[in-house]
Amino acid sequence: MCKQMNLEGLTTEARNEATKKIDQVSTLEMVTLINQEDQKVAQAIEKVLPQIAAAIDAAAERFKKGGRLIYCGAGTSGRLGALDAIELTPTYSVSPERAFGILAGGEKAMYQAIEGAEDSKELAIEDLTQHQLTARDVVIAIAASGRTPYAVSAIEYGKKVGALTISVTCNNQSPMNQLAEIGIAPIVGPEVITGSTRMKAGSAQKMVLNMFSTGIMVKVGNIYQNLMVNVQPTNEKLIQRATNIIKEAAEIEESQAKEYLEAAQLEVAPAIVMAKAHVDFQKAKQLLAEHDGRISEVLA
């Protein structure tokens, strides 16, 4: 049987003095209060930028060597992790096997609450064991409270295996922050609605994860200048986006960009190298392989 969790003293569970009368104000006043509280999120993120940068550097090194990004969490936190992982495939051509989310309660938990799942430390071990966690991998455990048993256990098991462990929470001095190799804890203060951590805490977690995964993609060469050069052009909109990226990066006409995209078999990065270095597709692929996919180094 699980011990009852003590929520006293958690910033995310405290009452917000500024919103105690939110049920008595006009709709405009209500959304103004929410907006004022939301502005505190970016300020909280600013204070943990060094930790986010450290997490990016450490995780990128593992990822370059074949390691995986494994996001673990329950409820909103777990869903945010899964969302971050899912988006890396269409945006940066990262294989779903290289970045994925594990939710307490399984795939059904993406759409509905699975009672008791977040309280099971054994379930986290089972899930990570099923995915054959190794020392090359990165475990990103996410929980607003910083003490959800499932997420705590994910860190504990990750450390036992030798994986890099990163926690994303919104409470200082939490078990997760103390256990993880790198702890990221933006303190956003009490929620607008007491304990509703899908609000400010969820927004903070989303911003941290956006920075984290984007930073890794920059480090591994999936971004040139500020262009997503490994986007998968799987539909008409994305084919046009890919064409525009090549046009911008190579400073050529749209018609030429389309020709290079076709010649590069719809791969954006080789198309840019072909256009700027005046080489064929195979040579462009070779050059990218020799420089870890970083176009800026190929063209230096």
Curated annotation (Swiss-Prot):
Listed InterPro entries: Etherase_MurQ, Glucokinase_regulatory_CS, MURQ/GCKR, SIS_dom, SIS_dom_sf
Keyword Lyase appears in the UniProt entry: yes
Enzyme class of the recorded protein, top EC level: lyase
Known pathway: Amino-sugar metabolism; N-acetylmuramate degradation
Assigned EC number: 4.2.1.126
Molecular functions (GO terms): carbohydrate derivative binding; carbon-oxygen lyase activity; ether hydrolase activity
GO BP annotations, alphabetical order: amino sugar catabolic process; N-acetylmuramic acid catabolic process; peptidoglycan turnover
Residue ranges annotated for the SIS domain, each copy included: 59-222
Domain of life of the organism encoding this protein: Bacteria
Pfam families found in the cross-reference section: GKRP-like_C, GKRP_SIS_N
Keywords (A to Z) from UniProt: Carbohydrate metabolism, Lyase
Chemical reaction(s) catalysed: N-acetyl-D-muramate 6-phosphate + H2O = N-acetyl-D-glucosamine 6-phosphate + (R)-lactate
Subunit structure comment from the entry: Homodimer.
Function: Specifically catalyzes the cleavage of the D-lactyl ether substituent of MurNAc 6-phosphate, producing GlcNAc 6-phosphate and D-lactate.
Any further remark recorded for this protein: A lyase-type mechanism (elimination/hydration) is suggested for the cleavage of the lactyl ether bond of MurNAc 6-phosphate, with the formation of an alpha,beta-unsaturated aldehyde intermediate with (E)-stereochemistry, followed by the syn addition of water to give product.
Entry's family note: Belongs to the GCKR-like family. MurNAc-6-P etherase subfamily.
The protein's name in its UniProt record: N-acetylmuramic acid 6-phosphate etherase 1
Record lineage: Bacteria, Bacillati, Bacillota, Bacilli, Lactobacillales
